[in-house]
């Protein structure tokens, strides 16, 4: 087999792998909902929705909508930090962020990041700048989520979780938090060991990331925005709990948020749908909450953030990023 044949085989394999993985995630999502529907819970869920206090639901929706420009602001910090000689204005970033969040809701999360990278590359004529800024944005957002989840596991409200699950989760999240911080702090040492190695290019990128995160105002600013973004999501969880008259305190909402979102980012279902509902239903059962109410609560969380992302669908249809001269910094 010649080189060209091998390359064609690789490309063909990649073309098959993507749809296959998406199909498997769809099967997992559908399987979870079939499991939940086995007792006809969905008919009872409709009754729960009918009695929900839509003033609280509106507050949750407002929190979800407000996240979009905040995520855009955080991402723009990285976009402009990667190439400080030129600046991208906020409005194209808001538009692209809205589009990416929409695709992330209806497809695997990586699809949203892929769309963001593609559209920003069309705007800036730089794939490197686009991909690097998206990776930084995603990495910081996930790291803050890990930290919040770790804190949540030590709140008194988390003591109602099964001890084994709580301790294992704390160990995993703690390890991730320590490894992430250590990798960032030790980047110069790691990079020096990779000089002359084929991974030296990655070392240069890592040094750039460390400089942005630790040696400029961009890192602290993006960190602050990340905590606000996740804080809004926690408030949305609390508001939805109040809308359905669930006996959950704000502290319990922090714990529930950590469980819901950490499960949602596990790449085994479409946008976390299905697996999130199963986990929340089982978790709230420990609080004595009826399964149909727990399912309605979890679905409402997904619906609220899906509704907040819907403007991104319209923007996707209307927005056409065209390369234009960027403002000098």
Give residue spans per PLM region.
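Predominantly cytoplasmic-facing regulatory/coupling regions of multi-pass membrane proteins
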Residues: 1-98, 155-265, 291-299, 303-329
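Helix-loop junctions at the membrane interface of multi-pass solute transporters
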Residues: 80-82, 116-124, 284-286
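Hydrophobic alpha-helical transmembrane segments in multi-pass integral membrane proteins
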Residues: 268-271, 278-302
């Amino acid at each position: 087999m010649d080189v060209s044949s091998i390359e064609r085989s690789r490309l063909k394999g990649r073309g098959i792998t993507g749809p296959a993985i998406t199909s498997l995630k769809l099967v997992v999502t559908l399987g979870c909902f079939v499991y939940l529907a086995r007792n006809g819970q969905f008919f009872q869920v409709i009754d729960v929705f009918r009695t929900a206090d839509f003033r609280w639901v509106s507050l949750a929706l407002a929190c979800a909508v407000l996240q979009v420009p905040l995520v855009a602001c955080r991402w723009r910090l990285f976009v402009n930090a990667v190439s400080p000689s030129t600046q991208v204005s906020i409005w194209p970033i808001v538009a692209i962020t809205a589009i990416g969040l929409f695709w992330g809701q209806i497809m695997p999360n990586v699809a949203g990041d892929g769309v963001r990278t593609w559209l920003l590359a069309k705007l800036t004529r730089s794939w490197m700048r686009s991909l690097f800024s998206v990776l930084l944005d995603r990495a910081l957002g996930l790291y803050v989520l890990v930290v919040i989840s770790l804190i949540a596991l030590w709140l008194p409200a988390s003591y109602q979780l099964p001890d084994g699950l709580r301790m294992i989760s704390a160990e995993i999240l703690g390890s991730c938090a320590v490894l992430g911080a250590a990798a960032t702090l030790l980047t110069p040492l790691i990079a020096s060991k990779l000089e002359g190695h084929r991974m030296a290019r990655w070392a240069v990128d890592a040094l750039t990331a460390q400089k942005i995160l630790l040696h400029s105002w961009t890192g602290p600013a993006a960190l602050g925005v990340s905590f606000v973004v996740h804080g809004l999501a926690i408030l949305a969880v609390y508001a939805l709990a109040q809308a359905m008259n669930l006996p959950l305190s704000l502290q319990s909402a922090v714990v529930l948020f950590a469980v819901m979102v950490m499960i949602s980012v596990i790449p085994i279902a479409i946008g976390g749908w299905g697996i999130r509902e199963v986990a929340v239903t089982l978790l709230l059962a420990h609080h004595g909450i009826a399964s149909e109410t727990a399912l309605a609560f979890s679905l409402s969380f997904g619906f609220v953030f899906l509704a907040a992302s819907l403007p991104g669908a319209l923007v996707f249809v209307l927005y056409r990023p065209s390369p234009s001269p960027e403002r000098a910094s």
